[in-house]
């Protein structure tokens, strides 16, 4: 399930037919899909707006990060977080010698979980929605993947890095070596020309993760 903006319709990915469907709310999601499984509570993976997540690529090594502990990792986000750092949930992804830290306000997590719970659903995974975009083939700042629709604008620059975009010209200034932008079709366009745009969206990798 993809929540593109805080109050936007939900987008639901159908793996069997490789297509998105829009629903207005969690309750409508339950009404439509409630009979798909017999268990009382349905499990969903929620892709939330990337604007809610903070990211830090730490230069500390594994031992130093372990010594910091959870509270120490929270304070790595002190300069960028509007939420008190004690109220941040932290996740760490390590690739080779690189350590990527992600922070999300606990209040956001609880709000999404509560919305799903009221509709009889259970969120089992939370992921920033830039991960729906395919990974650029050139990840040294030379190529980025861009997605835009009426609800959001997203950018992915590498396997573990991406963001919500508010003003595109400023973003381009951050990538002085940029040579290629891969633009994905909006999922809203699928409903205008499903035979063409849906095929492009599937082949380009949106929601293939």
List each language-model region with its residue ranges.
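Hydrophobic/aromatic-enriched cytosolic interaction surfaces used to assemble or bind macromolecules
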Residues: 1-209
């Amino acid at each position: 399930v993809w929540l593109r903006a805080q109050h936007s319709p939900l987008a639901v990915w159908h793996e069997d037919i490789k297509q998105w469907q829009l629903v207005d709310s969690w309750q409508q999601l339950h009404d439509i899909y409630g009979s798909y499984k017999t268990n009382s509570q349905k499990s969903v993976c929620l892709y939330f707006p990337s604007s809610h997540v903070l990211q830090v690529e730490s230069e500390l090594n594994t031992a130093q990060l372990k010594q910091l502990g959870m509270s120490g990792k929270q304070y790595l986000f002190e300069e960028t977080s509007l939420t008190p750092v004690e109220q941040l949930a932290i996740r760490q992804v390590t690739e080779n010698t690189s350590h990527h830290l992600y922070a999300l306000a606990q209040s956001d997590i609880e709000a999404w979980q509560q919305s799903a719970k009221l509709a009889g659903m259970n969120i089992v995974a939370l992921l920033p929605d830039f991960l729906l975009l395919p990974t650029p083939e050139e990840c040294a700042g030379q190529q980025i993947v861009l997605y835009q629709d009426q609800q959001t604008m997203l950018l992915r620059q590498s396997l573990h890095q991406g963001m919500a975009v508010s003003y595109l010209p400023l973003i381009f200034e951050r990538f002085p070596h940029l040579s290629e932008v891969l633009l994905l079709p909006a999922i809203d366009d699928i409903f205008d020309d499903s035979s063409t745009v849906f095929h492009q969206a599937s082949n380009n990798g949106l929601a293939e993760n």
